Amino acid sequence: MHRYLLALLCCIPVSCQSANDEEPPLQIRIATFNVAMGLETQGALAAALESGSDARLKQLAAILQTARPDILLLNEFDYDPVVDAAGLLNRNYLAKGQGGRQPMRYRHHFRAPVNTGVDSGLDLDRDGQKGGPNDAWGFGRFPGQYGMLVLSKFPVRTDESRTFRNFLWSAMPGALRPSNPDGSSYYPDETWLQLRLSSKSHWDLDFNIEGRELHLLAFHPTPPVFDGPDDHNGRRNHDEIRFWRDYTDPSGADYIVDDQGAAGGIGPGTPFVIAGDFNADPLDGDSYPGAVAQLLDAPWIDSSCVPRSAGGAEAAREQAGANRRHRGDPATDTGDFSDQQVGNLRLDYVLPSKGLHVIGCGVFWPAAGEPGHDLVSMSDHRLVWLDVQL
């Protein structure tokens, strides 16, 4: 437990369940963090990883050495199949104690292609031209921009894991197909029938945790903005979130087919955690109505442990602006955004299945004067963590 104490000084943990007399032998911390390392040019992240001197990556390492998650999803971390990003991050940053913190290492990782920056060959943004970043299956200037990486202290059963990058949006029953104000379809049939649902990907990763099974359902849906009255991004965000609701519902997953051709959802009773930057706040922001409630309100998902931080409450109070109009508790915010437009929001989640023994959760967002306050500027998002006993 001592390895969590420093992290607990930097955020407000929420105790969700008291330990019983027969504690399971293993407690683990699962976290998600949008690190905003989707850089503007291909190869820029690789160069920063190789240098060992990038200021933001040093901040990232310091945050991880403080919070010390056992399983971690990084969002907006460029994917390049020829670059050993996990190895470089381990060797050049995590293996070096940042600011006197204890070094660490992740022995296992998972990475895979994503849809961002992969040219669709279609004119998806209807500007009369093909090949632009908005014409990729997911917005991006090059393949792999804004990718995902999972780091773990436990092995991933890759043979039992699944990806859904190629799943078609139109294959989802009742999909929210975007439409123009006059009722006509925003995408012509030829385009609609080719569109992929995932803006990055959906991953179901099966972990072997000292003989115990736990699935990480990882994703990063598109922001519900940067569109028009058709709300094509808002609707896609809604359905990307809905995918995991259906996948974890034994009665709703028959239509789902993974990239390897296997059908169906997660097995009944299988323990799981859904993690990522959902780009959807329960009460504020521009997401499609009820988008994140699809998961928060699912009877088989435990959303009772709501991560909080002192820094989130402080930031909303001091920045004011759009935050004054918000209905949500600012202590639960996980992102620091434009005060004149959207304000700060709760976008990042780690949601366990019912039945997992939840110990606590939190947001790494130290207030002024708390240890680590100087680190959070490395991203506009904050690390969110959940502790469970298996």
Question: What are these model-derived regions, one by one?
Answer:
Residues Q145, V150-K153, T158-N166, S170-H215, ...:
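Feature for exported/extracytoplasmic and membrane-associated proteins, marking the mature portion
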Residues C16-M148, L176-Q194, E210-L214, D227-P229, ...:
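N-terminal, active-site-proximal structural segment of metallo-dependent hydrolase catalytic domains
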Residues L214-R235:
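Active-site His/acidic residue clusters
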Residues A36, N115, P155-R157, T222-V225, ...:
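Short loop/turn segments at secondary-structure transitions that flank enzyme active sites
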Residues H2-A7:
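Sec-dependent signal peptide recognition
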Residues V35, E76-F77, F154, P221, ...:
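Active-site metal-binding loops of divalent metal-dependent hydrolases
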Residues P155-T163, F167-P173, D206-F207, N233-I274, ...:
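Metal-dependent phosphoester-hydrolase catalytic domains
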Residues L8-Q17:
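Hydrophobic h-region of N-terminal signal peptides that target proteins for export
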